[in-house]
Swiss-Prot record:
Enzyme class: transferase
Name listed for the protein in its UniProt record: Pyrimidine/purine nucleoside phosphorylase
The encoding gene: ppnP
An example molecular function term from Gene Ontology annotations: uridine phosphorylase activity
CC terms in the record's Gene Ontology section: cytosol
E.C. designation(s): 2.4.2.1, 2.4.2.2
InterPro entries (alphabetical): Ppnp, RmlC-like_jellyroll, RmlC_Cupin_sf
Keyword Repeat: no
Reactions this protein catalyses: a purine D-ribonucleoside + phosphate = a purine nucleobase + alpha-D-ribose 1-phosphate; adenosine + phosphate = alpha-D-ribose 1-phosphate + adenine; cytidine + phosphate = cytosine + alpha-D-ribose 1-phosphate; guanosine + phosphate = alpha-D-ribose 1-phosphate + guanine
Function field: Catalyzes the phosphorolysis of diverse nucleosides, yielding D-ribose 1-phosphate and the respective free bases. Can use uridine, adenosine, guanosine, cytidine, thymidine, inosine and xanthosine as substrates. Also catalyzes the reverse reactions.
Family to which this protein belongs: Belongs to the nucleoside phosphorylase PpnP family.
Amino acid sequence: MSEFKNVTAVKKANVYFDGKVSSRVIILPNGERKTLGLMLPGEYTFSTREEEIMEMLAGSMDVKLPGSNEFVTYKEGQKFNVPSDSSFDLKVNEVVDYCCSYIAD
């Protein structure tokens, strides 16, 4: 899906890592929450509360998911799942445009 219709958008951005990662929350008509964001090149660690699906819209990054000892490269058009109550490491190689979907328990 390349666009979302009839959404509620939160005006204030989520800003992390001194502005190198930012996102905005959108809420779909069915209550589903997503964030649309950008990441600048760098290395980051994020923690999750809910399960997340990260969809790569542009760029590439290396991802080390929970339980793995190795980084895997994800590029435009790919996605990966992150379990709830965990953390994951990123090595962003170029500007990344992403959509994160949150899966409620």
